[in-house]
Amino acid sequence: MKRDLVLVIDFGGQYNQLIARRVRECNVYCEVHPYNLSVDEIKQMNPKGIIFTGGPNSVYGENSPLCDKAIFELGVPIFGICYGSQLMSHILGGKVATAPVSEYGKTKVDVNIESKLFEGVSSSTICWMSHTDYIEKAPEEFKVIGNTPVCPVAAMECEDKNLYAVQFHPEVMHTEEGTKMLSNFVYNICGCTGDWKMDSFVEKTIEEVRQKVGNGKVLCALSGGVDSSVAAVLLSRAVGKQLTCVFVDHGLLRKNEGDEVEEIFGPNGQYDLNFIRVNAQERFYEKLAGIEEPEQKRKIIGEEFIRVFEEEAKKIGTVDYLVQGTIYPDVIESGLGKSAVIKSHHNVGGLPDYVDFKEIIEPLRLLFKDEVRKAGLELGIPEKLVFRQPFPGPGLGIRIIGEVTAEKVKIVQDADAIYREEIANAGIDKEIGQYFAALTNMRSVGVMGDERTYDYAIALRAVTTSDFMTAESADLPWEVLGKVTTRIVNEVKGVNRVMYDCTGKPPATIEFE
């Protein structure tokens, strides 16, 4: 049975993925496509609704992204957001101009609650504005259904044609009733049924993979991260022992993480698959000896991983399919819009060029990260793995500033384990987007037990974020930071100082290297 589809047409807005996530939270399937998607392509997709995103341009500017006017004649409900609202007005005969007063931040908007878009919404509601242009005059067929003191057309509708537009951003959390507005659009206006459920997705994908693979052999590079783990379990459910997972332990994992991965996926684990663990720690340390530049470290770790994986793949022999944990943000960012679960060979991550196989299987390519976690829970994967903290591909190699050595790896592993343990003990682990300890390349003088020390400084990092594109430093309780600091300097040999990084992103990145 074909599911309902809402298309998000991307005009360059920073929140395009967030819009799609919010729609999916309403249990409606949603895809993001570029603004130059043709009307014929849209017809073939047969969407129940279309959402135009925001964007940084002015609709009257040269080379600004526009859309075909024919899209408004398809009879499909359309919801324009910010730039998308201005675009709708501009193409249909309204007037868009530079606003006398720009609006940015939380703004009280008066709305007409008789509109289907604002059913169940307060007549005066807090919304997030971010615009320098505005709709000075709505198109003739449109009715104004929202305004602020300086924005006469904060929302408008043409109910007969199911066209709706708002100047604010209903998708961001600062718009207090934004989720309700999006729900009204997909249900009250588009007539969606809410058929996007994770249990049905998992069942359908397992059956698709089973039919495709048949008796073929499948190979998966298992990192122990959320994406590759969920992909591996899903494939295991579909084809069992036809799947071989290769886990390369490069010695740059968090404390005990390699053993935890083997405990879950290895011979004594709960999954029906073949598991190979390659202990390549010394090999990676040798390659990284004397290397301090971050990008060079990344490159060495990536290339060596491919070499190790290639060697193991050759031992297995020819495989029919290679599994990759590609998720939907990767698809959007690569400009690929098609939604097939299994597709032909293309190079993602370097591995396909070095392994002999027929096709790639990407079972998670329709899912956002939060949906991957939901799929993991649906598959019965332990919560400690499903909600594992994000971890970079190069591992601790980029959480050790400067040269990587076995001694430094142990220091940062021990410090990070203490930090994660105390965050969990305080019950705030689910409130923080990402948190970890890093080893600086700085040594400082200290005093411990009446003895002078000259040891390393550990930097603690914790951020809150909804999308990892921007982030703010987490306001951790001093009591927690104090306990973490005391434990690290007392329990981790080679450390006499602990610092907390208060920098946001931007200007800093979340990782140190």
UniProtKB/Swiss-Prot annotation:
Q: Which residues form the active site?
A: 82, 169, 171
Q: Which InterPro entries match?
A: Class_I_gatase-like, GATASE, GMP_synth_C, GMP_synth_GATase, GMP_synthase, GMPS_ATP_PPase_dom, Rossmann-like_a/b/a_fold
The UniProt entry, under Pfam families, shows:
GATase, GMP_synt_C, tRNA_Me_trans
The record ties this protein, via CDD domains, to: GATase1_GMP_Synthase (cd01742), GMP_synthase_C (cd01997)
The record lists the catalysed reaction(s) as: XMP + L-glutamine + ATP + H2O = GMP + L-glutamate + AMP + diphosphate + 2 H(+)
Q: Which Gene3D superfamilies match?
A: 3.30.300.10, 3.40.50.880, HUPs
Chain sites annotated for binding ATP: 223-229
Q: Name one GO molecular function term.
A: GMP synthase activity
Q: What's the protein here called?
A: GMP synthase [glutamine-hydrolyzing]
Source organism lineage?
Bacteria, Bacillati, Bacillota, Clostridia, Eubacteriales
